Amino acid sequence: MPKGPVVIKVSGKYVNPEKPGLVKRYAQVLHELHSVGYRLVVVVGGGPEARRYIEAARELGLGKSFQDILGIEASRLNARLLIYALHPNAYPEPPRSIWELLEAYSTGLIVVAGGFQPGQSTSGVAALVAEAIGAELLVLATTVDGVYTADPAVDKSAQLIPRLSYEEFRRVVRQSMSPGRYELLDPVAISIVERSNIPVRVVNGSDPENVKRVVLGEELGSLITG
């Protein structure tokens, strides 16, 4: 019997060509969840490669839209790397739109996506996908252990918040997030999960087992709900 569905947003810092061992571990965890019936969609960020391309585009004087397109293509390459690691249990192409994603999702295979369009973060994509497939949970596999009162990379006194509302989460993001460092959800993504009342679990993605643990129902990291 199918379980979920669950959307997992994985930082591009963990799924990229510089970390094949970690990509393999993510593939193993996703295989395990899929084998026991979970319907899964994974959205992968662009990571360091995207930032390199964006910086090069900036130095060339290219506009934000072109920078976004390069970042999207980097995220799609990361997604394709994970797809190949998941073969044959993953849909063979990273979808380019929500419609392509829904078609891929209908196959029952694990779907792995990157970015969709300029001006939209991969976190925004994950929120939109979670809404479109009626996800029971959105997991954010980030570079921190959960949601903190401040960016833990710059404020050593920052405290982990185990549970918070969407509005409290929005306030933390607005006041405490350092661009490019403390990866959570952007304001548009928060609005999407709030309007559809999708629970969001934030965990440290450096260990793929953390993702499996929260999908299986363990209390870990931070939980954002209505």
Swiss-Prot record:
Keywords: ATP-binding, Cytoplasm, Kinase, Nucleotide-binding, Pyrimidine biosynthesis, Transferase. UMP binds at residues 46, 68, 116-122. Inhibited by UTP. One of its GO terms (molecular function) is ATP binding. GO terms for biological process: 'de novo' CTP biosynthetic process; UDP biosynthetic process. This is Uridylate kinase. It comes from the Archaea. It catalyses: UMP + ATP = UDP + ADP. The keyword ATP-binding applies. NCBIfam families: pyrH_arch (TIGR02076). Homohexamer. Pathway: Pyrimidine metabolism; CTP biosynthesis via de novo pathway; UDP from UMP (UMPK route): step 1/1. GO terms for cellular component: cytoplasm. Its EC number is 2.7.4.22. Catalyzes the reversible phosphorylation of UMP to UDP. The gene is pyrH. It comes from Hyperthermus butylicus (strain DSM 5456 / JCM 9403 / PLM1-5).
